A protein has these predicted regions:
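ATP-dependent carboxylate-amine ligase catalytic core
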Residues: 2-14, 23-108, 116-142, 152-154
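Hydrophobic positions on the alpha1 helix immediately C-terminal to the Walker A/P-loop
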Residues: 18
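Short, surface-exposed amphipathic charged segments that create phosphate/polyanion-binding patches used
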Residues: 71-72, 177-192, 276-280, 348-350
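Acyltransferase
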Residues: 190-233, 241-245, 397-426
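Cysteine-nucleophile active-site neighborhood
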Residues: 284-357
């Protein structure tokens, strides 16, 4: 079994495109690959869907044991684990290394491959690399990949090697990686028509895959955990999943499988499922029309079926959704109006405590908030949570109505208890 972390010295080094290319190339060797993504982001994990949707590893939301448990579970039966980092290697929570890529690498005791954009850089690249190595000597930085390199950087590679450092790739500027990078952060993986074979061939030509596999063999005992994703219980859990609704942590879905049977459906295709409870994740509902789903989910909510919704899912349940161009009626389950802006309204981790009884959670939680909209709730709106983020109303989040709970917070279920008693409530 092999596993390694691919990190950048900062955002924008090309680590995501290179990680995707390496994943494609290793898959082509008939090895079973499991991709992971450090941090709470939903978009980057989707770009590995040609292999498997990447699993988020986040020590703030999951704690260290949760990171180990998740990694072990998803690596069961796999040959290679590829963990794409977030931001720069040491960039973590509130100017610390906590929850950073380096923190995840140390929790799992994995080697790090550092991606450096060496365009317009020569020996300074060596100074940067040695600075990163010396910043935390307890971290195993196994080597480097030069990105946006020229023929000159073959000479720089020799300088690195004379110092005893591994250079796993001298990657030139290329149309295929540029095309890949244009999609990142803008489109979901399911919307991208990528040439996986071309990416694999590019990686085989410019990256020392054998060398990376050589330094990334793992033997840690905690990886040997039984994988059990069998669906248990008779509770039917309806989950909309398509281009409008796709922001779900894979571990959250796995938790739900332990209390019921997941029923996925596409509102954009007019699909619907008759279930006992509904979980509406985030995504881009503002970009699409789904009038039949609005009517359907309103009826289910008003019939007191439990409905849990996050961010974009909460917007669907609101009274209206307004942007500069339009004002749309939504399901009207919640007495809330949503206003979209061009300015980011909230970004960051959140901690939440329970302040009112609700159908889904009875303990505090950790999660993430990221949205360009704000909510205008009626003055008598009741809330289930108080958070240290923005939430719906100055930190109050988790709007309550009927048997519905909806808020801006994306909650990781490893940080709380998604009520197993729900089976007795429906």
């Amino acid at each position: 079994m092999h596993a390694f972390v691919i990190s950048g010295i900062q955002s924008g080094t090309g680590k995501t495109s290179i990680s995707i290319a390496i994943t494609a190339a290793i898959m082509r060797r008939n090895l079973k690959v499991q991709p992971f993504k450090v941090g709470p982001d939903f978009i980057d994990p989707s770009h590995y869907s040609f292999c498997e949707w990447a699993v988020n590893l986040d020590s703030f939301m999951m704690d260290e044991d949760g990171v180990r448990r998740s990694f072990s579970k998803w690596m069961n039966g796999k040959d290679v684990g590829i963990i794409e980092g977030v931001m720069g290697l040491f960039d973590g929570y509130r100017l610390s290394t906590f929850s950073s890529t380096s923190h995840i690498a140390k929790i799992l005791n994995l080697p790090v491959i550092l991606v450096m954009d060496v365009k317009a850089m020569s020996l300074s690249a060596l100074a940067l690399f040695e600075g990163f190595r010396n910043f935390d000597r307890g971290l195993n930085i196994a080597g480097v990949i030069f990105n946006n390199a020229t023929r000159f950087h073959q000479k720089l590679k020799r300088v690195f090697e004379e110092r005893g450092y591994r250079v796993f790739g001298v990657v030139p500027k290329s149309e295929i990686l540029e095309m890949e990078s244009r999609h990142l952060g803008l489109h979901l993986g399911m919307e991208v028509d990528r040439d996986v074979n071309a990416l694999a061939e590019f990686a085989e030509e410019h990256i020392d895959l054998d060398g990376i596999l050589e330094v990334s063999e793992i033997h840690n005992e905690f990886y040997k955990v039984e994988k059990d994703f069998e669906e248990n219980g008779n509770l039917r859990i309806g989950i909309p999943f398509d281009q409008a609704f796709s922001f779900y942590y894979r571990d959250n879905l796995d938790v739900l499988k332990k209390i019921g049977r997941l029923e996925f459906f596409s509102p954009l295709k007019g699909e619907r499922v008759d279930c006992d409870v509904y979980y509406i994740g985030g995504g881009y509902p503002e970009l699409y029309e789904f009038p039949d789903f609005l009517k359907f989910i309103k009826k289910e909510a008003l019939d007191e079926k439990p409905v849990y919704a996050e961010c974009g899912g909460m917007m669907v349940l609101a009274r209206s959704l307004e942007s500069e161009e339009t004002r749309r009626k939504m399901a009207g389950v919640l007495d809330i109006d949503i206003v979209f802006t061009k300015k980011l309204q909230a970004l960051g981790y959140v901690k939440g405590e329970i302040i009112n009884e609700n159908p889904f959670f009875d303990t505090g939680f950790r999660g993430h908030e990221f949205h360009y909209s704000y909510a205008i709730p009626d003055s008598d709106m009741r809330f289930a949570f108080r958070t240290d983020g923005r939430g719906i109303d100055n930190g109050l989040d988790g709007a309550l109505a009927y048997n519905t709970l909806a808020g801006y917070s994306h909650i990781h279920f490893y940080s709380t208890k998604f009520l197993p008693e729900l089976r007795e409530k429906v």
